[in-house]
């Protein structure tokens, strides 16, 4: 090994040099011989020991290198270098002494650093092509191979430097820079902020992911209580309603999955999220959502449950208020109702008739049928919803997020279908009127929304549609779900059930 030869020579030479030179890194010591010797190599000038090294090859190289620069330049360089110590390691004591005004005092070199510094100088001279990183690796390996006797000179020199350092800086205290901890803190803070920023989007995406999960997902979502059973749903306890955007975040994190990029993420359980709290963030973010974008995800059937609509469609569908065609838009309008009043209007026309009917009719059954014709085109008319479990199932898929979870609490089996049937306009209409308190600012935007508006009305606009998110809302639906079996019955019951849960469980921020 060519490399080893110089190293072995170095150790011998260093033993000599170390005893002679008080500090291998002392620039003043190095100033003695190097300059007069006229050696043009800068590195050698700074190292007294290196002057003692055999200079066969290095000298030849120096000759060729020196030719490149005029003598005056070389002399100027060596002159400058005389007073400057290039050691990467803590500077020699004297240099430190001169730079005491500098705030940072370097630590004294340890034995390995003494060795590495001297060896790097020597090798850098002899093998200028060596990459510094490779050089360092090799020096480390060699150091490990050295035996105690070979290491002794370096150990002694390091001790001498330490003693000297202590003299020069009696009050010196090693204070490692704490940048890393700061960075970690910053990173944590950044993460937190990122999460807060992400959460609204993440939530939407999660919703998207949610709605696609078909009835199975819905049944899983059923109730906050059952929630734990959800295979997809995050294991969040149902009692986290007050969490801000955090719940969504937490859900994502709990699952240990990256925030949903493609809506594949298991649904965030909005039931645990207080819609009111989410609304501001969400709404602000929602503006970026394109209703058409969501529409593409809608199944041709118009089951709003499809992820694209995120829950907008889901909700609309779940309510069965929006038509299949309308669902995408209505979903959009549900989502966007606050932001984009315009989208709702087109859907509202078909839906509007049901809405008016709904509030007035506690029976809801009769209005239901009238409403059904307009809505049937929409998405499994409400009537169909209640009447046809199969279809409603599909629609239910839409509702999967909304009703299933909440209604399913009670319905569990047919949460989707059942939810729908109860959702049928009749149910909504009776329940809706009571629900249309100020909460439901939505109603203005969504006539048809009125059905959801109780949900949407939650005052959270978008989320309101996802009533299941709001614990208060869930109960509202749950009762409906019960009645789902018998649409007519729910109509009478629904208002009370909804209202009661609303009051009892309403958790407004």
Curated annotation (Swiss-Prot):
Gene Ontology BP term (one): positive regulation of branching involved in ureteric bud morphogenesis
Key words of the record: Acetylation, Activator, Differentiation, DNA-binding, Isopeptide bond, Nucleus, Phosphoprotein, Transcription, Transcription regulation, Ubl conjugation
Motif position, 9aaTAD 2: 290-298
Pfam family, one: HMG_box
InterPro entries: HMG_box_dom, HMG_box_dom_sf, Sox_N, SOX_TF
Region (PQA): 63-103
Protein name per its UniProtKB record: Transcription factor SOX-9
UniProt source species: Pan troglodytes
